[in-house]
Design a protein with these regions (language model features):
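Structured aminoacyl-transfer and RNA-binding surfaces used for tRNA recognition/handling
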Residues: 2-279, 289-306, 310, 314-348
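Alpha-helical interaction elements
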Residues: 286
């Protein structure tokens, strides 16, 4: 049972082994940390020989959720404006319940939500590390719940769904710490999962600290990470396709891809607010990185984002806004630079 002061009384989700059967082996220490592995964990993993197209993977996920009676919710708007300027997680759909103690949520069910996060891990020179992007599709299931037992049911279904896309239980590790955390008005307990050595998401039981009856489950992964786990293809090739071999830095590709999502959702560059975040992201694109434009990359990115989020602007308008912002900084120097050896523009 959740109490009004949950951090002082940790919730023991291991008391029923997270609802897992006897084929799972649990190890835990005195600090509450635990790892759960399948008893057949030593079997080799063979990556999918034929990677699914993005639409195919999304369709498989949606079908798996639908089979359990979980319907797909429409995406949240990219402009958030509450605690963050942009939507950074699908869990923001339950903000009214968890943060305000209100008896409603914005969305529930299966939610493939495009998100933007500026917190991706970077190396010593500031470049994004493999496995991280500024924007990605947060594959989520968001559910208000009334009993903690619903948590284990949602988790069990997720394991079944992962198996359906080729990520079988014997290659998964479930781990976490059996202790409650608190961040401002929200408390939670998090269980992580990884496929072999690759983290692929988590499931969190969440509740309002002042009113624990306001409770929800947030199951989250990333579409790109799931595809990476399935195929074990090189990360940048998976994320950017043919553009990864065009001689352009991954951070530049990432910035244009993210800007396409934001501009396509009606956010324009500005001095502050959501537009300020967009301007900051595009500052990573040097004027000489794309002297002939970014239209081909924008078109491909626009098609990707359109799979999960209807775009307010067509791709040619998005490309125009992005190019105008890139060249706003230094039009003279941009037009005087020589052409690069390769380009990712429609106009080459």
């Amino acid at each position: 049972m959740l109490t009004a002061n949950p951090p002082s009384r940790p919730l023991d989700l291991l008391s029923d082994r997270l609802g897992l059967g006897t084929q799972w082996e649990i190890e835990h220490d005195a600090n509450g940390r635990f790892e759960i592995r399948h008893r057949d964990q030593g079997t080799p993993y063979r990556p999918a020989s034929r990677p699914l197209q993005w639409a195919g993977l999304l369709n498989q996920l949606e079908s798996g959720f639908r089979a359990a009676g979980v319907t797909r919710a429409r995406p949240l708007p990219m402009r958030w404006g509450r605690d963050t300027e942009l939507t950074i997680s699908a869990v923001q759909a339950v903000d009214p319940l968890l943060k305000d103690g209100k008896p409603y949520v914005f969305r529930r069910g299966y939610l493939p939500q495009p998100v933007v996060r500026l917190t991706g891990e970077r190396d010593h020179v500031g470049a994004l590390r493999e496995g991280f992007l500024t924007s990605f599709v947060n594959v989520s299931r968001i559910e208000p719940v009334t009993r903690t037992a619903e948590f284990t049911g949602i988790f069990d279904h997720w394991l079944t769904l992962l198996s359906g896309i080729g990520l079988h239980a014997r290659h998964l590790t479930i781990h976490g710490r059996n202790a409650v955390w608190q961040r401002r008005e929200v408390c939670g307990l998090t269980v992580h999962f990884r496929h072999l050595d690759l983290p692929i998401g988590d499931i969190v039981l969440l509740w309002n600290a002042a009113d624990p009856s306001c409770m929800a489950v947030d199951l989250g992964s990333g579409l790109e990470r799931l595809a990476w786990a399935r195929t074990r293809r090189p990360w940048w090739e998976l994320a950017f396709g043919r553009f990864a071999t065009a001689g352009v830095a991954a951070d530049v590709l990432d910035a244009v891809r993210t800007a396409t999502l934001l501009v396509g959702n009606g956010i324009a560059p500005a001095a502050r607010g959501a537009g300020g975040v967009l301007r900051r992201i595009l500052s990573a694109v040097p004027v000489d990185a794309a002297p002939l434009g970014v239209s081909t990359l924008v078109r491909a990115s626009h098609g990707f984002w359109s799979l999960t989020s209807p775009m307010a602007l067509p791709w040619p308008e998005v490309a125009f806004v992005i190019e105008r912002e890139i060249h706003r900084r230094d039009v003279t120097s941009a037009t005087s630079l020589p052409l690069p050896r390769s380009s990712w523009s429609d106009r080459t």
